[in-house]
Every structure is written in C-alpha cells, then in structure tokens.
Amino acid sequence: MATATLDKAALSRLFTDYSLEITPKDVEALENAAHMIPPGTLISVTFLPGAEYEDRARAAKRIQELGFRPVPHLSARRLIDEADLRTYLDMLKGVIDLKHVFVIAGDPNEPLGIYEDALALIDSGILKEYGIEHCGISGYPEGHPDITDEKLAKAMHDKVASLKRQGIDYSIMTQFGFDAEPVLEWLKQIRSEGIDGPVRIGLAGPASIKTLLRFAARCGVGTSAKVVKKYGLSITSLIGSAGPDPVIEDLTPVLGPEHGQVHLHFYPFGGLVKTNEWIVNFKGKQGI
C-alpha cells in the first residue's frame, strides 16, 4: 500500500510524545528496539493474568534504565484489597521513580476483591498518597461490548472529576481501532462535554491480519467490510499483514483545535521491534 504524503507540521504534532505498551515478557524485545525509541517515551506495562508483581516491577525498572518513562497499569478488579494494591505500589517505588500510572477496571466480569472499577481505586486516595502525579484512564470511541455508552460517559466524567479534585493530572488512552471516523466524532463529543485532557489514540502496530482480527473480536472493535477493506484487511483471507497507515492518513488532515491535545499510543500486537521499525520508516517517508 502506497504511503500518502501528509502535512508535515500536522503529522509531527500527532507523533510528538507517542507512547508504547509492553507486557512483562517483552523486556528483551524492548532492549532490541530501544535504539529506535526516543528518550523519555512513555511505555506502559500491562497488568494481565499470568504475570507476578515482581515481573511487572522488573519490566518497569528496565524501562526506566533504558531512558524511558514507565507507566505501570493497575487493574482494579484484579486487586484483592488495599494491602494488595500497596504491595505492588511499594514494589514499584522501590525500583522506579513512580509518578505515572494507568488505571483500568480490568477484564474480570466480577471483581476479585474490593475495587469494583477504576473509579473505586481512584477514589481511594491511595494514588495521591503515593505521589502519583499523572493517571491515565481508558476511552472507547467505538463503545464497549459489555458497557452502555451512557455508563462509559458517566464513568469518564466521574474519574476525571475525582482526579482533578485530588490534583492529579490525567490523560485518556483509547482502545485501538481501524477507523478514524468514530475517533474524530468521539473526540468532538468529549471536548464539547468539557473533557479537556490529552488523548492518546490507540493504534495497532503492524501485525498479521489474523492477529489483528483476533484482537478486534476480543476488544469489540468494529470490523465492517468497508472498514477492513480500507485498512487493508480481509475477512475471507487471513494471508498478509497490515499497519496503521490508513487511520493516520485519515486523522492527520482533519485534526484541529476543536479536538484538543492528541497523541498516538501503539499496541504492538505484531511485536515491539516490528512496530518501532514501522514508526521509524513511516516518519522517514514523511520527512518528520
């Protein structure tokens, strides 16, 4: 697929301060990709089942050692109680300069402990107590398969209000998607409602079509025939791979002041090295 030529200033703004995400198992891949990543880049550490606190803390420590800024995830429904949360935060403070976290409800349908959702954890006041200065929260431009749009909107406003009361800066990181249109509509909507914090638009790094469609199905991301064709995917053929070029090409010309501060967040489903090679090559082709 040919790369469209985009406005350099607009594209440069979009790529400024982009962020990445890793699992605790990706430390070696991060070391291999580190030379391609700008110093100070925000790199999230997921809170998924199958990893221990020590594994997550070790990954966060390595991120900082490599010159990047670690953003540990806190999955509210996977935490048993306050002591459990403090155990992890204490462990993190012992190995990194803990200033930035990302709080999400998490995937269990029923909480494993006392935190019903992300708001419950934020409202606890523990983040402020531990010196957290910035908290990321989730955004869903295409909605959530298990939560109504009304509940999603209320939850976002409640979390933003709680963080502002506590003097903690916030940003919103969105679910990944293949279509720019719902992202743009959602941005206009939240800005009109007074949500003024930075937004990190989630994009899937280059990956096999099979992998992208699997993650889309798991996350409730739209894969209509029109959307997947434009993205370079095929529902009938799982051969080949695709990258986020089409979404960026659609976003860049139309993002304006009414959309607020916008950055990119890459989910490296096809591998961290592959994602960063794509970023370097894309920026090189565009001359930014």
Swiss-Prot record:
<feature type="binding site">
    <location>
        <position position="107"/>
    </location>
    <ligand>
        <name>FAD</name>
    </ligand>
</feature>
<feature type="binding site">
    <location>
        <position position="144"/>
    </location>
    <ligand>
        <name>FAD</name>
    </ligand>
</feature>
<feature type="binding site">
    <location>
        <position position="159"/>
    </location>
    <ligand>
        <name>FAD</name>
    </ligand>
</feature>
<dbReference type="GO" id="GO:0106312">
    <property type="term" value="F:methylenetetrahydrofolate reductase (NADH) activity"/>
</dbReference>
<protein>
    <recommendedName>
        <fullName>5,10-methylenetetrahydrofolate reductase</fullName>
        <ecNumber>1.5.1.54</ecNumber>
    </recommendedName>
</protein>
<comment type="pathway">
    <text>Amino-acid biosynthesis; L-methionine biosynthesis via de novo pathway.</text>
</comment>
<feature type="binding site">
    <location>
        <position position="175"/>
    </location>
    <ligand>
        <name>(6S)-5-methyl-5,6,7,8-tetrahydrofolate</name>
    </ligand>
</feature>
<feature type="binding site">
    <location>
        <position position="107"/>
    </location>
    <ligand>
        <name>(6S)-5-methyl-5,6,7,8-tetrahydrofolate</name>
    </ligand>
</feature>
<feature type="binding site">
    <location>
        <position position="51"/>
    </location>
    <ligand>
        <name>FAD</name>
    </ligand>
</feature>
<feature type="binding site">
    <location>
        <position position="140"/>
    </location>
    <ligand>
        <name>FAD</name>
    </ligand>
</feature>
<keyword id="KW-0274">FAD</keyword>
<comment type="pathway">
    <text>One-carbon metabolism; tetrahydrofolate interconversion.</text>
</comment>
<keyword id="KW-0285">Flavoprotein</keyword>
<comment type="similarity">
    <text>Belongs to the methylenetetrahydrofolate reductase family.</text>
</comment>
<dbReference type="InterPro" id="IPR003171">
    <property type="entry name" value="Mehydrof_redctse-like"/>
</dbReference>
<dbReference type="GO" id="GO:0009086">
    <property type="term" value="P:methionine biosynthetic process"/>
</dbReference>
<dbReference type="Pfam" id="PF02219">
    <property type="entry name" value="MTHFR"/>
</dbReference>
<dbReference type="GO" id="GO:0005829">
    <property type="term" value="C:cytosol"/>
</dbReference>
<feature type="binding site">
    <location>
        <position position="175"/>
    </location>
    <ligand>
        <name>NADH</name>
    </ligand>
</feature>
<comment type="function">
    <text>Catalyzes the NADH-dependent reduction of 5,10-methylenetetrahydrofolate to 5-methyltetrahydrofolate. Is required to provide the methyl group necessary for methionine synthetase to convert homocysteine to methionine; the methyl group is given by 5-methyltetrahydrofolate. Is required for Sphingobium SYK-6 to grow on vanillate or syringate as the sole source of carbon.</text>
</comment>
<dbReference type="InterPro" id="IPR029041">
    <property type="entry name" value="FAD-linked_oxidoreductase-like"/>
</dbReference>
<feature type="binding site">
    <location>
        <position position="73"/>
    </location>
    <ligand>
        <name>FAD</name>
    </ligand>
</feature>
<feature type="binding site">
    <location>
        <position position="106"/>
    </location>
    <ligand>
        <name>FAD</name>
    </ligand>
</feature>
<keyword id="KW-0560">Oxidoreductase</keyword>
<keyword id="KW-0520">NAD</keyword>
<dbReference type="GO" id="GO:0071949">
    <property type="term" value="F:FAD binding"/>
</dbReference>
<feature type="binding site">
    <location>
        <position position="118"/>
    </location>
    <ligand>
        <name>FAD</name>
    </ligand>
</feature>
<dbReference type="GO" id="GO:0035999">
    <property type="term" value="P:tetrahydrofolate interconversion"/>
</dbReference>
